Amino acid sequence: MADVPGAQRAVPGDGPEPRDPLDCWACAVLVTAQNLLVAAFNLLLLVLVLGTILLPAVTMLGFGFLCHSQFLRSQAPPCTAHLRDPGFTALLVTGFLLLVPLLVLALASYRRLCLRLRLADCLVPYSRALYRRRRAPQPRQIRASPGSQAVPTSGKVWV
């Protein structure tokens, strides 16, 4: 078996054994693909949650910057028909004041959603690509002598 960079020599019965190089390469590609898919789903979920919760503050800031005479001097009908500069200033101030609490709320809801979906459990470490697990040895059953009765033990010790 060829040496795998970063892999340790396995002592028989000591732990996981290194994979073959081709098997290691294929597992590394699959692990990378799975981790990239999980990361893309995380990013999509983050954008969806942040976009939904921060929408009121972003809308206020957008109209405030778009219609205030100090910034873009837009003469669009929605800007001139409804508010003047003091109203757009109020939109800017309210948007900035709402931004931080809504951001905290959005990040808390994203964290809760990630914990509920257990997305961190979907990430696979690269050590799984380099090493293959050994099967745990089966426990040997002790046979009772023909004349004695076998008493089932639960594995608990009462002291």
Swiss-Prot record:
Topology versus the membrane: Multi-pass membrane protein
Stretches the record annotates as Disordered: 137-159
Annotated keywords: Cell membrane, Developmental protein, Membrane, Transmembrane, Transmembrane helix, Wnt signaling pathway
BP term (GO), one: protein localization to plasma membrane
GO MF term list: PDZ domain binding
Family: Belongs to the TMEM88 family.
Gene Ontology CC: cytosol; plasma membrane
SUBUNIT field: Interacts (via C-terminus) with DVL1.
Official protein name in the record: Transmembrane protein 88
Localization, UniProt: Cell membrane
Function field: Inhibits the Wnt/beta-catenin signaling pathway. Crucial for heart development and acts downstream of GATA factors in the pre-cardiac mesoderm to specify lineage commitment of cardiomyocyte development.
Transmembrane segments: 43-63, 88-108
InterPro entries given in the database record: TMEM88
